[in-house]
């Protein structure tokens, strides 16, 4: 009989301590990866916020500088929707609240007619009281959109619309000269820019439609005015003496950054004092000086 021998096998595995060490290392690695992910996510979020903020500041500056530069162009001798100056400043608005203009911000109203509304379909005769447009006669009316001018080949003539029938406008006074077919007909507007309580840059054409929001997250808007004697004023007594405008647009991020808490503060801007309470918003201030082309000619 063969001898029965007991076979033994070498046992493999991990001890409890080894397993605990491995699990601890695993969780440390996962925590590091997660922390890195959160950090990258935060950086991406802030970069997106800052990018949007910078774009908003540039957009707001673009709207303002373009139309302020053209203030007074095509302006009639009479007032347009209550405005008789090419530029009408309004300083530190809404100190007492109630008009949906952000407290402490400035407001500016300009009269300009630089945008073409239509063209003449046919030549217009001297002393005629009507003109026929190619189209877009609905841009005009006899009340709030009644002032126009016709480009008379280097000569600008203002008229007021007194009647509309299709694309035929009745105007006053009678035409001062002959205008060729294709001559530009432009609507003169009174435009007011301000910042509302929701921190939107707004644009109001003062025709009854109210202020329309243009650009979000604009925290402050301030102006300074260079006068005909070269001096600067935040509140010029005679708007007709304005020759240039310094525009200051302060944009901020849409949300606070918890890691920036207590480091952000609205800065002083022209005659608007800095805020006294710190927060977590990031900000960007853009400043531009715009010469007004059509004043002082």
Where are each of the predicted segments found?
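Aliphatic-rich helix starts adjacent to a transmembrane/signal segment
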Residues: 2-4, 11-65, 69-71
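Autoprocessing Asn-cyclization modules and mimics
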Residues: 89-180
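N-terminal start-of-chain detector that recognizes signal peptides
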Residues: 23-26, 33-36, 42, 73-79, ...
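Intrinsically disordered, low-complexity segments enriched in polar/charged residues with Gly/Pro
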Residues: 15, 23, 37-40, 148, ...
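Short linear sequence signals and composition-biased patches located at protein termini or domain-edge surfaces
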Residues: 3-5, 11, 49-52, 56, ...
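Intrinsically disordered, low-complexity segments enriched in small/polar residues
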Residues: 7, 12, 32-35, 147, ...
């Amino acid at each position: 009989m063969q001898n029965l021998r007991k076979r033994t096998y070498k046992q493999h595995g991990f001890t409890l301590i080894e397993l605990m060490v491995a699990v601890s290392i695993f969780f440390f690695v996962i925590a590091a990866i997660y922390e890195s992910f959160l950090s990258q996510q935060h950086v991406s979020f802030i970069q997106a916020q800052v990018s949007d903020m910078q774009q908003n500041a540039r957009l707001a500056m673009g709207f303002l500088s373009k139309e302020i530069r053209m203030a007074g162009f095509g302006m009639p001798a009479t007032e347009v929707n209550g405005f008789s100056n090419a530029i009408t400043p309004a300083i530190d608005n809404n100190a007492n609240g109630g008009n949906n203009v952000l407290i402490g911000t400035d407001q500016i109203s300009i009269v300009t007619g630089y945008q073409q509304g239509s063209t003449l379909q046919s030549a217009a005769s001297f002393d005629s009281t009507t003109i026929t447009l190619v189209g877009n006669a609905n841009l005009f009316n006899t009340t709030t959109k009644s002032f126009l001018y016709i480009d008379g080949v280097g000569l600008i003539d203002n008229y007021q619309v007194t009647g509309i029938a299709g694309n035929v406008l009745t105007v006053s006074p009678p035409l001062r000269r002959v205008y060729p077919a294709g001559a530009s007909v432009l609507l003169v507007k009174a435009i007011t820019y301000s910042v509302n309580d929701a921190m939107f840059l707004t644009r109001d054409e003062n025709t009854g439609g109210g202020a329309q929001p243009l650009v979000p997250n604009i925290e402050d808007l301030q102006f300074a005015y260079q006068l005909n004697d070269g001096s600067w004023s935040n509140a010029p007594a005679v708007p007709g003496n304005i020759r240039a405008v310094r525009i200051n647009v302060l944009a901020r991020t849409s949300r606070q950054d918890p890691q920036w808490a207590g480091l952000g503060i609205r800065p002083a801007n022209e005659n608007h004092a800095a805020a006294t309470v710190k927060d977590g918003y990031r900000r960007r201030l853009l400043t531009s000086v715009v010469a007004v082309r059509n004043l002082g000619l």
